[in-house]
Amino acid sequence: MRRSSWQKSKDLVTFPLRAVSLFEQDRFGLSSLRTERFDYVAAEVQGECLDVGCGRHNLFIRDFLNGRGKGIDVFAYEGLEQENIVEDITRFPFPDASFDSVTFIANLNHVPAPKRDPELAEAWRCLRPGGNIIVTMGNPLAELLVHRVVWLYDRLFKTHHDMDSERGMEQEEEYYLIDAEIVARLKKVGFARIVKKYFGTQWGLNALFIGWKDMHLES
């Protein structure tokens, strides 16, 4: 499922077309935006991964990591098993140091603000020393436009692209988070060496943040 250099070149050139087409599956020899996100994140995952907010069918773990990890979500999306459902997002059902990577793919903004620090603290707890957290977030303007376009598209064509509307938005969820908040929250719970990497084939309008649970902090 990982993209070749040739595939990335095609995706780079056709990004505007892919962005407005809203297709969820790869088509016409082009990658969907979801495939693109998953590809960038998978490149940063090490070992066993916990995907928080995994969504329908637990696709990232299933298809991009070949089952190497666990996916959890608070909503019983299509294709999820009971083991994937976590009612309290501030308490993950895993022992300390269970995973090598934890991912939040395009969803930390959908965690209600008062629960973001506790949930990130759980990610820290579940990571092994030397493990990393990976958070993706789009450009604020792009995120606002995408949410509006997807919402309108679903209503006009009776499709179901908008998972946020499917489960219902809670108070204190947001359409995007600014970089400063993401970095500050990661640092607050203990993550170090935080870097931002842009999605080149999405023209820099999406990016991932990587933070590390340094080994010396556990000694």
Model-derived features: positions:
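A short acidic, Gly/Pro-enriched loop at the edge of an enzyme's catalytic core
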Residues: 90-102
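Class I (Rossmann-like) S-adenosyl-L-methionine-dependent methyltransferase catalytic domain
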Residues: 1-49, 55-91, 134-219
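A short His-aromatic
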Residues: 109-111
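A short, aliphatic-rich alpha-helical micro-motif
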Residues: 42-43, 96, 120
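A short glycine-rich, Lys/Arg-flanked "PGG" loop and its adjoining helix->strand segment in the class I
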Residues: 117-129
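Surface-exposed loop/turn positions
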Residues: 47, 98, 130-131
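A short beta-strand submotif of the Rossmann-like class I SAM-dependent methyltransferase core
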Residues: 104-107
